[in-house]
Amino acid sequence: MKVLRDGTTHEGTGAEIMEQLRQLTFDPDEYPDTETYIWQLRTNFIRSTGMDCTLPDGDTERMALAMIAQLGKIGALEVVEDA
């Protein structure tokens, strides 16, 4: 998978891309792992858009792909190449 965010291309699995984005946060230690970061993104997504953001049960990869899709819908990033 390949996504474009703020002029930077991120490549990898959905979970790997979310980990890359987590590392770019102001304080990556605030989110101890990728799954925690995804849940925080979800909370911010709902608060800022007023839209629902359902994430699937299961592993981090499925959650990451769903979150990337939601972020793509609002233009927060662009999916250049699907998984």
Where are these regions (language model features)?
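Acidic, aromatic-enriched beta-alpha/helix-loop junctions
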Residues: 24-53
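Intrinsically disordered, low-complexity segments enriched in small/polar residues
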Residues: 5, 10-12, 48, 56, ...
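Short amphipathic alpha-helical segments that mediate assembly, nucleic-acid/protein binding
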Residues: 14-18, 34-42, 61-67
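N-terminal acidic leader/helix
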Residues: 1-35
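Extended aliphatic helical segments
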Residues: 3, 38, 79-80
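Short, compact, well-ordered microdomains
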Residues: 55-83
